[in-house]
A protein has these predicted regions:
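Short, functional N-terminal and low-complexity linear motifs
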Residues: 22-29, 126, 156-162
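Gly/His-enriched, cation/cofactor- and phosphate-binding structural elements
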Residues: 129-198
């Protein structure tokens, strides 16, 4: 069993059950883990540092074999400094780095929403399409799915950016997003943008 990017603390009961059934579990995450069980069948790579994301942890485990995907994932987790630091190990143009940033953001964006029907792609289907690509830049350049994600993201963000705060002061603002699919999709990336830009 491979578990990526979900809190061990929140999912501890399921983890304990899997280990009790003698499953082998590979667990990589950057969220609060609580007490990590000591078990021969558990390999846990956990780092709760705010500058670390699961993609960077997996990249370390894989010794940089898929660094381009790690950079993409770090951008998707809104860790731009981490992504740029990782990207120093790549030989790519500034334009390509920008493409990895966009793709990471779009992958993250496609994961928000309480129902798969709200999303542009079922995350499993998107994963399979990404996996079929030779790498993230191949996906950006050659997959029509990239354009679908890009268009959806831009349209949803334009709606979000048109919202006026219910309340604002010099240190905070409160926004109410409508109960619509676009708002559910954009909630995470819009929050990231607000945090990054303010």
């Amino acid at each position: 069993i491979t578990v990526l990017d979900v809190s061990m603390d929140t999912n501890r009961a399921a983890l304990d059950k899997a280990l009790a059934s003698n499953a082998t579990v590979f667990y990589v995450d950057h969220h609060f883990a609580g007490d990590i069980p000591q078990h021969a069948n558990l390999t846990a790579i956990i780092n709760e540092s705010p500058e670390v994301c699961t993609a960077a942890l997996v990249n370390g485990y894989l010794k940089g074999r898929h660094l381009d995907w790690a950079v993409t994932g770090a951008f998707g987790d809104n860790l731009h400094d981490t992504a740029r630091t990782l990207a120093k190990g790549l030989t790519i143009t500034a334009e390509d780095l920008s493409s990895l940033e966009e793709l990471g953001t779009y992958i993250n964006y496609n994961g928000y929403g309480p129902a798969i029907e709200d999303l542009h792609f079922d995350p499993k289907e998107l994963y399979l399409r990404l996996y079929a690509a030779e790498g993230p830049l191949d996906f950006v350049r050659n997959s029509p799915d990239f354009e679908k994600l890009s268009t959806g993201y831009r349209e949803d963000m334009a709606r979000a950016e048109a919202l006026q705060p219910l309340h604002a002061n010099p240190t905070s603002a409160v926004f109410l997003l409508p109960e619509e699919a676009w708002a559910r999709r954009v909630s995470g990336v819009y929050s990231n943008d607000l945090a990054t830009n303010n």
